[in-house]
């Protein structure tokens, strides 16, 4: 199973000048993974739904929120390989394998469109184990309702990165991600949506360190597996703070936030025309 796989271009198209991955981050390829049976998509933003990756997985089964299927059909994924879900829709895929799309506090949009497709989170129940995948979401009491319906969870995979007070309703702070895991009654929380793309002004390791510390404070177990590391459902998971042994890489604009405060409006005005043009061209390409 894959959740929101993005193995395509280095930049989040159609923003051809960024955001991009951290310099040393791209060290793996889709071809290095085993055969993928199922792909779960949470919403259609470019950093969660990548056209080239989807087309490379054209023999997999896709589970998507309402409206996201239209993108996949345009990209030549057969309709019989796509299942669409509304919030709290459930499906039994095979004996002992049940899934459900659950709400998230976010939005959708691709190209020049906005909110033309649904967004959500996923619950996966495999025999006696339950996994929650948040996708993108701000913090809300919906986590309590999800636990009431499907909990407790062995693992809650929750976004904890790319946060900022300007968009705190659609992305969680690390401390909120821990609270979400507590609300979900999760044995272990795995933080995601961090250390990949530069989408906010916090430091590279800030999400992981804050989640780790908040987990210790609240007695919520946190595991931060490295890429390629494996674990077995139902068995103890390590909480190794590996990022402390990695040299920090903070782009210059994360170190000069005062300058950024002056430059951002100018960059916005200079780039808005380019963004609109590139989004239009990208949408034409996808269509």
Roles of regions detected by a PLM:
Residues 38, 61-63, 67-73, 140-226:
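Cap/insert and terminal regions of metallo-dependent hydrolase folds
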Residues 2-40, 44, 51-52, 67, ...:
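Pre-active-site segment of Zn-dependent metallo-hydrolases
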Residues 114-121, 125-132, 137-171, 220, ...:
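Mobile, glycine- and charge-enriched loop segments
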Residues 4, 43, 50, 62, ...:
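Divalent metal-coordination and catalytic microenvironments
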Residues 32, 65-129, 210-230, 234-237:
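Metallo-beta-lactamase
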Residues 5-7, 44, 104-105, 135-137, ...:
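Active-site metal-binding loops of divalent metal-dependent hydrolases
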């Amino acid at each position: 199973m894959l959740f929101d796989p993005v193995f395509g271009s280095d930049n989040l198209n159609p923003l051809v000048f960024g955001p991009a991955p951290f310099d040393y981050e791209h060290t793996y390829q889709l071809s290095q993974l085993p055969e993928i049976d199922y792909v779960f998509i949470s919403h259609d933003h470019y950093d969660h739904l990548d056209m080239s990756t989807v087309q490379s997985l054209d023999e997999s089964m896709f589970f998507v929120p309402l409206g996201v299927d239209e993108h996949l059909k345009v990209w030549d994924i057969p309709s019989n390989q796509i299942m669409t879900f509304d919030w709290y829709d459930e499906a039994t895929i095979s004996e002992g394998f049940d899934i459900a799309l659950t709400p998230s506090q976010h939005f959708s949009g691709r190209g020049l469109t906005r909110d033309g497709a649904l967004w959500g989170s996923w619950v996966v129940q495999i025999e006696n184990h339950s996994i929650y995948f948040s996708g993108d979401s701000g913090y809300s009491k919906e986590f309590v309702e999800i636990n009431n319906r499907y909990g407790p969870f062995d693992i809650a995979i929750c976004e904890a990165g790319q946060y900022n007070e300007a968009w705190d309703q659609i992305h969680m702070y690390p401390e909120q991600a821990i609270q979400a895991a507590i609300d979900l009654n999760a044995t272990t929380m795995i933080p995601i949506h961090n250390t990949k793309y530069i989408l906010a002004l916090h430091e590279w390791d800030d999400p992981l360190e804050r989640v780790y510390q908040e987990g210790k404070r609240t007695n919520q177990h946190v595991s931060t597996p490295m890429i390629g590391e494996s674990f077995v459902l139902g068995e103890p998971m390590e909480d190794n703070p590996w990022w402390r042994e990695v040299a920090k890489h903070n782009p210059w604009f994360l170190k000069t936030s005062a300058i950024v405060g002056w430059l951002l409006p100018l960059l916005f005005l200079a780039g808005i025309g380019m963004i609109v043009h590139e989004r239009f061209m990208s949408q034409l390409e996808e269509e």
